Amino acid sequence: MDTIKIFNHGEFDTIRNELVNLLKVVKWNTINSNVTVSSTDTIDISDCIREILYKQFKNVRNIEVSSDISFIKYNRFNDTTLTDDNVGYYLVIYLNRTKSVKTLIYPTPETVITSSEDIMFSKSLNFRFENVKRDYKLVMCSISLTYKPSICRIQYDNNKYLDISDSQECNNLCYCVITMDPHHLIDLETICVLVDKSGKCLLVNEFYIRFRKNHIYNSFADLCMDHIFELPNTKELFTLRNDDGRNIAWDNDKLESGNNTWIPKTDDEYKFLSKLMNIAKFNNTKFDYYVLVGDTDPCTVFTFKVTKYYINLNYE
């Protein structure tokens, strides 16, 4: 994640009441101080928080949530140094979602981000709370995220970077660099397609020349029938199938029906595709074989080498 994430859709509503009930049995500390609780109850709450966070973050291998939960009772002038440890994140959950209590975070001395929503931010950032004068109105706990290894990160737009991974988990698009074994019916050597989780293919480039017109096919076999053969009217001669029932990009248990296909529209999105093409030029040592069979007599076999780059792009 970035250094700050604001949760403004009630993601933690399911455990807010549990925190309020836990507070009722907590022995209060001196006035204007926080109380840290660790018990079997907080372990259960931490487990719930972990499950919620897993749904929020992509490409995360492991999430650790401390079972130490702090009920905060600072006023606006208190310092907020809770620990000397600046590795990981703080998660702040408001006990009630009134807009009076605010979290102020300072990414730079000249910049302040103010939020009255549940929020998670890096421990390395300076922060304070505002309008926390009476009672315990929010809780804090420590979070540690471990990400799955990525090949690299590339810029998607002015404010966002995307991880490029060789793992299907938590991703929804696959950029496939496809090299074709020589065959007298095939006119191409390399094409690149973007495959969504329904199996639809967007033709991106061939020989590293990018298409500006968006050609979308329901499957890689459909793309091949339309694009790679020298013969005219190929559809009248044979059809293609994969005898293993495999998709070119995804394991069958990862496929989902009814997905909308991502289509580049803006200059930033086309620049992103160009960067993806450049990454593929220099990271193409690992590949899988994919085979399509034409129903001729005897069968015609087409063999492809496929290098896969997985990304997660929110576009629905």
UniProtKB/Swiss-Prot annotation:
BP-aspect Gene Ontology terms: symbiont-mediated suppression of host NF-kappaB cascade
Cellular component GO terms, alphabetical: host cell cytoplasm; host cell nucleus
Record's note on what induces expression: Expressed in the early phase of the viral replicative cycle.
Keywords: Early protein, Host cytoplasm, Host nucleus
Subcellular location field: Host cytoplasm; Host nucleus
Domain of life: Viruses
Function field: Plays a role in the inhibition of host NF-kappa-B activation. Mechanistically, blocks the subunit p65/RELA translocation into the host nucleus.
Membership in a protein family: Belongs to the poxviridae OPG031 protein family.
Protein name as it appears in the record: Protein C4
Originating species: Vaccinia virus (strain Western Reserve)
